Every structure is written in C-alpha cells, then in structure tokens.
C-alpha cells in the first residue's frame, strides 16, 4: 500500500505542474481536464493515506502530524491552481507549498513504514 500511496502523490505532482502550465498558456479546456483528473488523485491520496494510517499507525503525534500536513499539501495544490485560473499571484503559495511538501515527505520517510533513506 505504501507504493500505491507514493505513486498517487507523484502522479498528482506531475498533474499539478501540467495543469499549472496549461492555465499559464491559456489552454482552459486542457487545464480543466487535467485539473479534474488531479482532483481524482486527491481522493486516491487521501484514501491510501487513511488506509496506511489505520493499518500501521500506533496512534502517536507523528502520524497525526503527517496526515494533517498531507491534507494541507493537497489544499495548497488546489489553491495554487484556482488562483492561477483566476490569474491572481501565486508566489507566496508556491513558497508555502514547497515548504509543506518537503515537511510532509521528510516526515513520511522518517516514519517506520516509510523508506529509510536517512
């Protein structure tokens, strides 16, 4: 299940950049399609993350923090695309998104069911 969860968020990140670039180039139809597919992946990320949480969590703060950071990451992804669609500035959101994404990934790798890279 860990591999499925990682695959869904990697695909979601790719779809985020594709949707963002399509909104930037003015291709509204293509951007809308990829944005809707990305929303499907949000649901898959949440479902696989919840399944991992229920199956492996020993109910401590690190797991709850990881879950909260993951939901914040998804929220920032959606906010980035909506603001880009409305042609508003996204600079601050990008900074926040990168910081929260890094924290989420690092915490996920640190947890016992993550890959022990460090």
Curated annotation (Swiss-Prot):
<feature type="transmembrane region" description="Helical">
    <location>
        <begin position="62"/>
        <end position="82"/>
    </location>
</feature>
<keyword id="KW-0812">Transmembrane</keyword>
<feature type="transmembrane region" description="Helical">
    <location>
        <begin position="4"/>
        <end position="24"/>
    </location>
</feature>
<comment type="similarity">
    <text>Belongs to the UPF0344 family.</text>
</comment>
<feature type="transmembrane region" description="Helical">
    <location>
        <begin position="33"/>
        <end position="53"/>
    </location>
</feature>
<keyword id="KW-1003">Cell membrane</keyword>
<protein>
    <recommendedName>
        <fullName>UPF0344 protein YisL</fullName>
    </recommendedName>
</protein>
<dbReference type="InterPro" id="IPR010899">
    <property type="entry name" value="UPF0344"/>
</dbReference>
<dbReference type="Pfam" id="PF07457">
    <property type="entry name" value="DUF1516"/>
</dbReference>
<keyword id="KW-1133">Transmembrane helix</keyword>
<dbReference type="GO" id="GO:0005886">
    <property type="term" value="C:plasma membrane"/>
</dbReference>
<feature type="transmembrane region" description="Helical">
    <location>
        <begin position="93"/>
        <end position="113"/>
    </location>
</feature>
<keyword id="KW-0472">Membrane</keyword>
């Amino acid at each position: 299940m860990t591999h499925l969860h990682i695959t869904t968020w990697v695909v979601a990140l790719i779809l985020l950049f594709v949707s963002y670039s399509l909104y930037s180039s003015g291709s509204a139809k293509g951007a809308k399609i990829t944005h809707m597919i990305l929303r499907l992946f949000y649901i898959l990320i949440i479902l696989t993350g919840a399944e991992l949480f229920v199956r492996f969590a020993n109910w401590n703060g690190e797991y709850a923090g990881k879950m909260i950071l993951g939901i914040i990451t998804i929220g920032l992804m959606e906010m980035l695309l909506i603001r880009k669609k409305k042609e508003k500035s996204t600079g601050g959101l990008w900074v926040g998104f990168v910081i929260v994404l890094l924290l989420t990934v690092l915490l996920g790798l640190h947890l016992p069911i993550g890959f022990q890279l460090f």
